[in-house]
Amino acid sequence: MACSVVVALLALLSLSGLEAIQHAPKIQVYSRHPAENGKPNFLNCYVSGFHPSDIEVDLLKNGKKIEKVEHSDLSFSKDWSFYLLYYTEFTPNEKDEYACRVSHVTFSTPKTVKWDRNI
């Protein structure tokens, strides 16, 4: 009985230690298909390797938040870091700029990564 109590306490201590670990998210912005002006595509923002799980992700068009955005369920890797995919349909052209803005406890201000149509 005492042994199981000790094991339970050690498990709780190790889980509470996970809260202290913080990892900044890696942000990747890319289109599903090679960009062609006037041709519908999907804009993706893949955010990975972050901890804790609280995060805010916005896709932007010309600096303004895109409202119709979908995302995957929050998932975690073998190292207990988290990852998410945010995506929306868009039609690239010469004038519009697209980006992904991420707010996380590891950033003092939100980080914005622009979409590079050549990637």
UniProtKB/Swiss-Prot annotation:
Record keywords, A-Z: Disulfide bond, Immunity, Immunoglobulin domain, MHC I, Secreted, Signal
Signal peptide per UniProt: 1-20
Origin superkingdom: Eukaryota
A Gene Ontology cellular-component term: extracellular region
Annotated ranges, domain Ig-like C1-type: 25-114
GO BP terms: antigen processing and presentation of peptide antigen via MHC class I; immune response
Family: Belongs to the beta-2-microglobulin family.
Subunit structure: Heterodimer of an alpha chain and a beta chain. Beta-2-microglobulin is the beta-chain of major histocompatibility complex class I molecules.
Function, in words: Component of the class I major histocompatibility complex (MHC). Involved in the presentation of peptide antigens to the immune system.
This protein's name: Beta-2-microglobulin
Biological source species: Mico emiliae
